[in-house]
Amino acid sequence: MTERSGRGGGTRGASALPSPDYYEQVAHLQQGLRNSEKKRLDLERKLYEYHQSDVCRAKLKYIKLKKYLKEICESEKNARIRNQEYLKQFERIQANITASLEKLQELKIEFETQIKKMQLLSKDSLGKKGELKDEDKEKVVMRAEINSGTAMSRGLYQPATIFMGRQMSAVSGIGDFTTERKSPQPTKNFSIPDPHSHQQTAQSSDVTGSRVVQTPGDTQCLNKSDKIDGKTSLQIGEKTPVTASALSEEEQTHCFEIGSNACQSKSNLSEGKKSAELHSPLWERLSPENRTTDLKCDSSRRSEGSEGEILTREHIEVEEERARPPVSPLSGSESCASENECPQEKPPARKASSDHLPCEDSQSQEPFRKKQEEQEEESLSSSSDLTVSVSEDDLILKSPELQTNLGDTMEQEDGTETLNVIHSEQERDAPSTGKPNCILQAPSTPDSPNESFTNLPAKELCNHSDILREGPDAYRTAVLHQLSQLCPRGGSDKEQVRFEQTPASGLLRTRSGQHIAALKGHDTFVQEEEVAKLSGVFLVSKLDQRTKATALLKKDLAEEHDNRLAVHSSKSSCSLPSTPSDESGIRNGKPTLWPKGVTTREQEDESREESTEESMAARMPITETKAYQRLKQSALQGSTHQAGDGFQEATAPTSQPPGLKTGSGTFKTKTTHKIASEASFSSSEGSPLSRHENEGKLTTNLKSKAFWSESDESNSEIEAALRPRTP
């Protein structure tokens, strides 16, 4: 320590150099470091080489495989343990299955034995039943042979149950017609036709005699009850021919008791003529020829009974019709149609039934038929209802096809009224019937809205039987009233179109022409207003059809109108009634409805010039107000007192019948304005027609401004259409 300190002191002080020992030590340390480093590198190189060698790899694989082997061994052990457990479970299940199989096998054996026993028992029972059936069949055959032998030995005869598709007879009882009734006495054989099945059941019993006897006089009509044992079989009044098998009084009374007990009704059995079959031998009665004759006789007797019943019913109906009080012409016409159609429908039935009738029966029925026909003719001639001679056209109207062609209910009612008018006019025009008391009745329908108290005078006049004695004016009024019923809402209504409805419209047009001819024959002046009223029935919406309808009426009146227009110029039908107005003094009233086409040539030329105004005014409907109805009523009552001036009564617009209303169509509006234009044109020409028109303005003033103010329609256009134009 001294040295070090000295050294240290000497270095410090003397700054001496390091000694060689130091260097040697350092060199020695460095050498050792180099050697250790070389070793380290050698070891690393060897390790690397070793890792790269196969031995090392094999060792690594071996180690890995060894580890895997250990794992496999462990998993194998676990699997063995699990498999052992599974085996134990399988053994247990197998033990259970074997036990159940043994039980099922035992049950199978038991069931098989039971099935075998049941099969054996069923075979035994079927065999026994078959043996019993065979024995029963043998017994039935033996009984049938015995019964047939005894029946043939006794000589009994039962006719065939089915002949020509009809069951002729069968053994039946009284109550249900299924059991056999035995009686100590011989009875009669009933043959009752069933209307539903067209089969015939017979009631029979043992007959002690050796003969089967039929009498033609035993066919009677028995009144049967509606139900027998709760089943509807025979209706009341059904024809039931009765065939007798014996002729004693005891048998008749016994048959009467059977009929009264079975059917609960009265039966009047009467014996008729004895036929030659009473003395005929048995083998003749049982021959096929006699069987067919018996069937024919039965059918003829049934037809005789039905014919007699039909005739008696006809006689009763005729007596009831004669005793019945008169009804409305609608029902009267229907009754006449039915009475006229019945004789036409009955001759085929009589002809069909007469084919099976014997000569004696037909001759016996002829007096009764003649008497019946005479009674029917007397009842028809003495009937108080409307009776006419039926023609082919009327039969067409009566046929049901007319009702299907009419379309709706309103047109059917109008068709019925048309038929009544045609009947009345046909009876009036017929040359064979010279009776003047034609009955013209309006159908009294309580639900008709068009009838009112204003119709009473015309109806009373029309219902009068001696209408021709009242004068031509009343005659014309009645016919026009009847025609007005055909179009209560106006002829121009589209629902009331009749021109396209054939054959009713054609017949009506022809009858209208006959009516005009009848008016001429009674020296009644026919004027243009009547043509307008008659043509109102045929008004339609189209212009060409209106022209056709009025041209048919104009044909009969063309020549006479021109001749009488000059004669009766002082009583012109074109007078337009007017009343003094508050503003203009005189205002034209409601003009008369003229048909298109019944005008002069000058008027037709004037109407063509004003066609535009007419088309505008035609679209405005005309409505009949209450004031106008009251005006018509007062005018009608005033016109009845003016019998002398019949021409002006029929032509004045207020004297039209109450039933003829102003419709809401276009044709009447056109004629209204056309008359105004014609009147203005004729006044400028100075014709006699216009002169009397001016005279009528001063005398027949009936309308005023107050009347137009009372109108229900407040529309100015409607009032303008209703108010006539001033010339």
Swiss-Prot record:
GO terms for biological process: spindle organization. The modification Phosphothreonine is found at T387. Residues 1-20, 176-226, 271-456, 564-727 are annotated as: Disordered. GO terms for cellular component: cell projection; centrosome; cytoplasm. The modification Phosphoserine is found at S328, S711, S714, S716. Its main location: cytoplasm. Residues 77-124 form a coiled coil. This is Centrosomal protein kizuna. It comes from Bos taurus (Bovine).
